[in-house]
């Protein structure tokens, strides 16, 4: 997810670990940034503290490619704007009249709905970050409406 919209979706077969995450960064992220004309040195990359994100391999990859990483507080995945984008996508997929028949139809629907996400959805999620962080501080790290 970028300030000006979503990148293209990438399908993952199986369980993601640090190795697969780094491969996605190398292949999919690099290709996406090139497609959109983005320079990694001008990007602040945000991710939560999931073990695959903090793996030595992924950390080294980011350092080697000149990305700045936004520091992220422990135990706060719900602050991550992408979690709200996943929720948006799930709601859209739930609007279909019938369940998909098989994984291929599900993936086709995911791609269709992902590409329909307007840049304003991403902008609103990112712009909501100060409010969400303030709510967490006010709740002393406890639960918030977000």
Question: Model-found features: residue ranges?
Answer:
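Residues that form ligand- and interface-recognition hot spots within folded domains
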Residues: 1, 49, 66, 71-73
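Electropositive, glycine- and tryptophan-enriched low-complexity nucleic-acid-binding patches
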Residues: 1-40
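Short, solvent-exposed loop/turn segments at secondary-structure junctions
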Residues: 2-7, 50-52, 76
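Amphipathic alpha-helical protein-protein interaction segments
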Residues: 14-18, 51, 75, 79, ...
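Surface-exposed helix-capping loop/turn segments at secondary-structure junctions
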Residues: 33-43, 118-124
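Acidic/histidine-rich, metal-coordinating catalytic segments
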Residues: 39-53, 79-80
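Preference for well-ordered, secondary-structure-rich cores of eukaryotic proteins
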Residues: 43-44, 57, 64, 69
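C-terminal anion-handling pockets and recognition modules
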Residues: 82-146
């Amino acid at each position: 997810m970028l300030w000006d919209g979503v990148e293209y979706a990438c399908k993952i077969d199986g369980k993601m670990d640090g190795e697969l995450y780094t491969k996605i960064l190398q292949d999919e992220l690099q290709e996406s940034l090139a497609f959109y004309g983005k320079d990694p040195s001008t990007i602040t990359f945000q991710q939560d503290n999931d073990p695959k994100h903090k793996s030595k391999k992924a950390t080294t990859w980011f350092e080697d490619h000149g990305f700045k990483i936004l520091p992220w507080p422990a135990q706060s995945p719900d602050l991550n704007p992408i979690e709200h984008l996943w929720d948006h996508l799930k709601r859209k997929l739930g609007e279909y009249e019938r369940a998909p028949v098989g994984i291929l139809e599900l993936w086709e629907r995911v791609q269709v709905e992902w590409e329909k996400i307007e840049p304003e959805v991403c902008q609103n999620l990112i712009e909501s970050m100060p409010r969400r962080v303030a709510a967490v501080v006010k709740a002393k790290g406890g639960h918030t409406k977000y």
